[in-house]
Amino acid sequence: EFYRSKLFDVSLSRLGSFKLRTLLVLAQKRLKSLDQDCPNDSFHKIRIELKKVRYAYEFLSEIFYFDGLKKYEERLKDMQEIFGALQDYDVWLGILERLPEVAGKEKLESKIYKQIYKTREEILKKRLKFIKATRKISRNLKIYYI
């Protein structure tokens, strides 16, 4: 069936740029909606979106030729690491909540919450520059399939 479809004759650069741009636009929209009131689950969902973007980006970036690709890859990795750190703190908090009451547990929970809020602030601080960089890459990808 694939060989008879319209996609059979589409170049990898055209198909790849469309897919990657779709992922970028979705991530960009979700990042815009983030704020201090969002639950950690919203941040986690964006982390998963960024992971998809990164894998597609790493797989397809060699077929595109325009300025800023390498720099964006570094920014993408940085954002993904920050989102990953937030998820790690959230997991540690969940583990700690399941443990029986022991001396120092509340103090440790307090430290983890502090790290969660610091990490969330860092994400919110960096997201606008990241959205701007994402928009630029997205526009450059668009030329491959229009």
Region annotations inferred by a language model:
Residues 1-146:
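Cationic, histidine-enriched alpha-helical/coil surfaces that engage anionic ligands
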